[in-house]
């Protein structure tokens, strides 16, 4: 019996560019292995694929080496946040408060 292949997408974005790769991987492939097979790391200089958080349709995958991909999955490689959202919110609130008190 021939091995079944699954069609998936791998996406990554920077402020300058977006990558959307359509791939076929063997059934039983883990998220980590699918990312490696996609060739994304070769296309994006400096991308630390093993150290990057990954999600499927917006939900973070906590164990990409264990989680298996399914037909039609969109694997999303996330970049780290540039600023702490809580700190940014605090700064905006302080600025708004100062403007109201004038």
From Swiss-Prot:
It comes from the Bacteria. PANTHER family: UPF0125 PROTEIN RATB (PTHR37483:SF1). This is Protein RnfH. It comes from Pseudomonas entomophila (strain L48). Belongs to the UPF0125 (RnfH) family. HAMAP family: UPF0125_RnfH. Gene3D superfamilies: RnfH-like (3.10.20.280).
